[in-house]
Swiss-Prot record:
GO biological process: G protein-coupled dopamine receptor signaling pathway; negative regulation of voltage-gated calcium channel activity
Name the UniProt record assigns to this protein: Guanine nucleotide-binding protein subunit beta-5
Subcellular location: Membrane
Keyword Membrane: yes
Length: 353
């Protein structure tokens, strides 16, 4: 028996060393492609001029920290979720609340708007993702029409509808992501590969195929093929948890925001990190990132209550936005690119333009 154990250990050790040497070879191959820096390529590009953005609307109504928000495709409505267990649908033009749902649990960490605008999904410490249809009949009880779609073995950290209302993608503290059928609640595909909690995910723009990117507490950002369930690319250059990932509008790159106080840009075709957005004066983690519609600007919300705006090509900061009175937890650019909304632990959401 003891010899069996020894053999197993030896095999394990040899497999580990083989894996390490393969990793080394991969890094060498990656390094061969590393012939020029992004800011060098962008040297001839004109610098951005004066950049002014202000808070145009403040949405008040949550009784605790705002944890997540998403825009409706109609460019007007917003769904937000909070630590108080409430999920609210807002009209961002008038600041009116159109719907409110009280979840059975607090810490609703994830919420998403369906592409049709006719439903919302949310979840958190209840380990599941619930879908609520939205109707404008004031007497209708939304909670009665709730569908429980996804079941994880730990908290739900993020959710997103695919390009239809019929499928939903979830990320969880159990270290997995999963694709579910909304109607039947059936698991269609699961994605295993993260070594710790998955904190965020983002779907590739629809033209670029069936992939999504996820980030988590293992400091890894992973790109997945939704059809096969396989990880097709992985990037491990952050020094702490990855809180947010967002695809570049063309789908050829993605940005990440991390507790290591940096945001980074990864080029999928070059298969490597191409830019780091950081300053010595920024010492707090980045909680949320999103691109402008053109992809030239990167908006990043931080735990020091600020929002930094970065020039993606030149790597420089073009603006810093003040207004929130606690950490910025979530941030999304509107579908038409005219504004963005940020949510904060100060219980409010702000629409900037």
């Amino acid at each position: 028996m003891a010899t069996d154990g020894l053999h197993e250990n030896e095999t394990l050790a040899s497999l580990k060393s083989e894996a390490e040497s393969l990793k080394g070879k991969l890094e060498e191959e990656r390094a061969k492609l590393h012939d020029v820096e992004l800011h060098q390529v962008a040297e001839r590009v004109e610098a951005l001029g004066q950049f002014v953005m202000k808070t145009r609307r403040t949405l008040k109504g949550h009784g605790n920290k705002v944890l997540c928000m998403d825009w409706c495709k109609d460019k007007r409505r917003i769904v937000s979720s909070s630590q108080d267990g409430k999920v609210i649908v807002w009209d961002s033009f008038t600041t009116n609340k159109e719907h409110a749902v009280t979840m059975p649990c607090t810490w609703v960490m994830a919420c998403a708007y369906a592409p049709s605008g006719c439903a919302i999904a949310c979840g958190g410490l209840d380990n599941k993702c619930s879908v609520y249809p939205l109707t404008f009949d004031k007497n209708e009880n939304m909670a009665a029409k709730k569908k429980s779609v996804a079941m994880h073995t730990n908290y739900l950290s993020a959710c997103s509808f695919t390009n239809s209302d019929m499928q939903i993608l979830t990320a969880s503290g159990d270290g997995t992501c999963a694709l579910w059928d909304v109607e039947s609640g059936q698991l269609l595909q699961s994605f295993h590969g993260h070594g710790a909690d998955v904190l965020c995910l983002d779907l590739a723009p629809s033209e670029t195929g069936n992939t999504f990117v996820s980030g988590g507490c293992d400091k890894k950002a992973m790109v997945w093929d939704m059809r096969s369930g396989q990880c097709v690319q992985a990037f491990e250059t952050h020094e702490s948890d990855i809180n947010s990932v967002r695809y570049y509008p063309s789908g050829d790159a993605f940005a990440s925001g991390s507790d290591d106080a940096t945001c980074r840009l990864y080029d999928l075709r070059a298969d490597r990190e191409v830019a780091i957005y950081s300053k010595e004066s920024i010492i707090f983690g980045a909680s949320s990132v999103d691109f402008s519609l053109s992809g030239r600007l990167l908006f990043a919300g931080y735990n020091d209550y600020t929002i930094n705006v970065w020039d993606v090509l030149k790597g420089s900061r073009v603006s810093i936005l003040f207004g929130h009175e606690n950490r910025v937890s979530t941030l999304r650019v509107s579908p038409d690119g005219t504004a963005f909304c940020s949510g904060s632990w100060d219980h409010t959401l702000r629409v900037w333009a």
